[in-house]
Amino acid sequence: VLSAABKSBVKAAWGKVGGNAAPYGAZALZRMFLSFPTTKTYFPHFBLSHGSAZVKAHGZKVABALTKAVGHLBBLPGTLSBLSBLHAHKLRVBPVBFKLLSHSLLVTLATHLPBBFTPAVHASLBKFLABVSTVLTSKYR
């Protein structure tokens, strides 16, 4: 559960991301694909090379979903319900992959925002991404 301080940290950190959300989302996907090759399984039709249009487009989708979630921290289940249905019932993404993407996103944010990525912000973002992952996997049962 995100505390008031966590929510404040998440909103402030995501605000620093600003217009870079889509490129950071794509970079996080690239990191995940390179670091955890089994995650490529769900993207057999994508060109997964560096800078590909498909990875950029999917990175933008990830970033848009996270931006929406940041704007609705008090109702993540309601906000992400459609995405949860999609990933559980249609795409059947391995729940572990959300943790791997979360890790890759944290590394990406730490790389681009080193002065703002304090231990407290890191912890708050980690909790937030864990909550998002929990919501996205909640309909797998």
From Swiss-Prot:
Protein name: Hemoglobin subunit alpha-1/2
Entry-annotated residues carrying N6-succinyllysine: 7, 11, 16, 40
GO BP annotations listed: hydrogen peroxide catabolic process
Family affiliation: Belongs to the globin family.
Tissue expression: Red blood cells.
Substitution effect: residue 20 to K: In alpha-2 chain
Function according to Swiss-Prot or TrEMBL: Involved in oxygen transport from the lung to the various peripheral tissues.
Source species: Odocoileus virginianus virginianus (Virginia white-tailed deer)
Cellular component, GO, one term: hemoglobin complex
CDD domains reported in the protein's UniProt record: Hb-alpha-like
Start and end residues of each Globin domain: 1-141
Gene3D superfamilies named among the record's database cross-references: Globins
Keyword field: Acetylation, Heme, Iron, Metal-binding, Oxygen transport, Phosphoprotein, Transport
UniProt xrefs under InterPro entries: Globin, Globin-like_sf, Globin/Proto, Hemoglobin_a-typ, Hemoglobin_oxygen_transport
